[in-house]
UniProtKB/Swiss-Prot annotation:
Natural source organism: Pseudomonas aeruginosa (strain ATCC 15692 / DSM 22644 / CIP 104116 / JCM 14847 / LMG 12228 / 1C / PRS 101 / PAO1)
Enzyme class: transferase
The keyword Cytoplasm appears for this protein: no
The protein's role, per its UniProt record: Catalyzes the transfer of an acetyl group from acetyl coenzyme A (AcCoA) to an acceptor substrate and releases both CoA and the acetylated product. It prefers the antibiotic chloramphenicol.
Domain N-acetyltransferase, chain residue ranges per copy: 31-186
Residues given in the record as CoA binding sites: 117-119, 125, 156, 161-163
UniProt entry tagged with the keyword Transferase: yes
EC numbers for this chain: 2.3.1.-
Keyword field: Acyltransferase, Transferase
Gene3D superfamilies: 3.40.630.30
InterPro entries: Acyl_CoA_acyltransferase, GNAT_dom
Protein name: Acetyltransferase PA5475
Pfam families membership: Acetyltransf_1
């Protein structure tokens, strides 16, 4: 990588404070990964609203047209221990745009957390899902979780492939044959 590219990449994310990482995608583009913050609420709303209907369906296992205030309240409610989220941002037209997010939330069974990852349609297939999930898995381990799981549509091939690559084991949901439960021992 040239010094001009390095300088450009560094300056795009120069004002970021706190824990963060600049990661390379499979096509050479860079994204900023950091914990979700309250200031990201509008970005999260725009991110969800820009997703294709198919991507929204895979993420929420149902039809939603846009992010309601109640949904945003739920998604933004993280405490960095029992619930965590990492956001992927790109510098675009002078603004930071959300292009992906991974999250977990503790479950009623001790030591378990449910996870999800969502990638903007124009950033799918570039390895961003794996980057976000690796950060999420590391934090879940550090926070004492012993198992992570995800409930996904059986038709979501990308999630099935990602989970397999990360070491999750999948099985059909015994309560809903259209869904798969992927589990990872932490």
């Amino acid at each position: 990588m040239s010094n001009v590219q390095n300088a450009s990449r560094s300056s795009a994310f120069a004002a970021v404070e706190g824990d963060h990482w600049v990661e390379s995608l499979d096509d050479g583009r860079h994204v900023l990964i950091r914990p979700l913050r309250e200031e990201d609420r509008e970005r999260e709303r725009q991110f969800i609203n820009r997703l294709s209907p198919a991507t929204r369906h895979f993420r929420f296992l149902g039809e939603i047209k846009e992010a309601s205030p109640a949904l945003l309240d739920q998604l933004m409610d993280i405490d960095y221990q029992q619930s965590m989220a990492f956001v992927a941002l790109v510098h675009e037209d002078g603004e930071l745009r959300e292009v992906g997010i991974s999250r977990y939330a503790a479950c009623c069974e001790e030591g378990q957390c449910e996870c999800a990852v969502t990638i903007a349609d124009d950033y799918q297939g570039l390895g961003l899902d794996a980057v976000l999930m690796r950060h999420l898995i590391d934090v879940a381990r550090r926070n004492g979780f012993r198992q992570m799981y995800s409930v996904d549509s059986a038709a979501n091939r990308a999630m099935r492939d990602l989970c397999c690559a990360l070491g999750f084991v999948g099985q059909r949901d015994p309560d809903d044959s259209t869904q798969v439960i992927h589990r990872l021992a932490l």
